[in-house]
Amino acid sequence: MANFDLTRINCQFLDRHLTFPLLEFLCGKEIYNQQELLEYILETVNKTNMIDYTMDTRKRLNLSQEMPDELVQRKAEVLATLKQLQNEVAPIMKATDILKNGESMKDSKTFVNALQKDYNFKVEHLESAYKLAKYLYECGNYQESTSYLYFCLIVMSPNDKNYLNVLWGKLAAEILTLNWNTALEDLTRLRDYIDSANFSTIQALQQRTWLIHWSVLVFFNHPKGRDLIIEMFLYKPLYLNAIQTMCPHIMRYLATAVVINRTRRNALKDLIKVIQQESYTYRDPITEFLECLYVNFDFEGARLKLHECQTVILNDFFIVACLNEFVEDARLMIFETFCRIHQCITISMLADKLNMKPNEAECWIVNLIRNARLNAKIDSKLGHVVMGTQPLSPYQQLVEKIDSLSMRSEHLAGLIERKSKQNNKESIDSWKYY
C-alpha cells in the first residue's frame, strides 16, 4: 500500500525531530525497504545533535559497533557547547522558583519586573535562554527544553524576532513529550498568533500549512481533538483554503475524524462537498468510501473501499489507533444509509454489505438496538430486520444550522478584514504622494 502512504509528503511539513516517530513506525511495516529506510533515518539524525540515536541507528545498519572518531569529536563538542550555554544562563537559574509561581503573576511585565529586581535579569539572559532551549531540543532533551521555552514565552514580547520560533519549538517539544493538554494550548496560541500577524499572503499560507500538519498529531491524541479538527479544518475558511491549495491529502484525516465522531454527523454534508471539489487533486480509499456511500449510493463499492481503508489506516502513523473505531463507525454508516432506502432488510444481505458473517451481523444489530442507537426490530424466524423511523433530533438540527452560520460569518469577516487592509494600504500609498 505504498501508493497510499503519506509519510513522505507529511514529513515535508514537519520539523526534523517530529519525523522520527513516523519513520520508526514505518520500520515496523513492510511498505519500504528496511535498509533504505534506516539509511534515511541515519542521514536525518546526523543533522541533529542526537549522538546516541545516531549510534543506535548505525548499529541497526550493522555498521561499526564502536563510535567513529568523528562522532566522538562531535559528542565532545556538543557537551562543551551545552556546558557553555548553561553557564550563560546560570544567573537566572535561581529564578525557577518564581517561574513555578508564574501563574500568580498578573502579566509578563510583572514577571519581568520581579526578575529584574530580584535576579538582576538582563536582555542578554533571555537570548541565552533561547539558545539553550534550542540546543537542548537539538540534542533530543525535549522535556528540559520546554522549561526554557516556557520561560521565553513569559518574558518575550510578541514583537521579539524569536517569538514565533519559540511558539513552534514549544509546540514541537510538547508533542514529542506527549503532553497533549499543553500541546493543545500551544497549538491554539500559535494559531492565534499566525491569524493575527502581519504576514504576506504567501507567508500566512505557508505557516498555516505547517500548522495543519503539526495539529493532526495533537488532534488524534487529545480527547477533544475529534471535534477541534473538524472545527479547524472544515469550518475555518482560512485553513480549509490552505488544505485545498497546499495539502489536499489532509482530507484523509478530516474524513477519518468525521467518520469516528458520531456526534458530528451533521458535518458529513459539508465534508462530502469538499471531497467532491477536491476529488481531481486527491483521492484515497477513505475519501472514496464516503463518495461511494453518500454520493453514488454504491454499497458494494463502499464495502470494497472499507476493506482498503483498513490497510491504509493500519499503515498511517497519525490514525492507526483509530482502526477498530473507524471500522465500527463505517459499518454503522453503511447500515444507516442502507436503512434509509430499505425498510425491511434481510440479515444475510446486511452481512454481505458489512463484510461480516450472518451471525456476527445479527449480534451487531442486536447490540445497536440494545444500546438505544437503533430503532428497529429483528424477526429471527424470517431473518429480517424491520426498521422504525429515524427522526433527526432538534439538537442535531440546531448544531447543523449553527455550524453553517458560523462558517458563513467567518468567511464574511475574512472578506471584510481583507477589504479593510486593502483600503488602508491604498490610503497609505496615496499619502506618500503628498
Curated annotation (Swiss-Prot):
One Gene Ontology biological process: formation of cytoplasmic translation initiation complex
Compartments, as annotated in UniProt: Cytoplasm
Transmembrane segments: none
GO molecular function per UniProt: translation initiation factor activity
Disulfide feature: none
Annotated ranges, domain PCI: 219-392
InterPro entries in UniProt: eIF3e, eIF3e_N, PCI_dom, WH_DNA-bd_sf
Keywords: Cytoplasm, Initiation factor, Protein biosynthesis
Annotated Gene Ontology cellular component terms: eukaryotic 43S preinitiation complex; eukaryotic 48S preinitiation complex; eukaryotic translation initiation factor 3 complex, eIF3e; intracellular membrane-bounded organelle
Protein family: Belongs to the eIF-3 subunit E family.
Functional description taken from the UniProt entry: Component of the eukaryotic translation initiation factor 3 (eIF-3) complex, which is involved in protein synthesis of a specialized repertoire of mRNAs and, together with other initiation factors, stimulates binding of mRNA and methionyl-tRNAi to the 40S ribosome. The eIF-3 complex specifically targets and initiates translation of a subset of mRNAs involved in cell proliferation.
Subunit composition and interactions: Component of the eukaryotic translation initiation factor 3 (eIF-3) complex. The eIF-3 complex interacts with pix. Interacts with mxt.
Protein name from the UniProt record: Eukaryotic translation initiation factor 3 subunit E
Species annotation: Drosophila persimilis (Fruit fly)
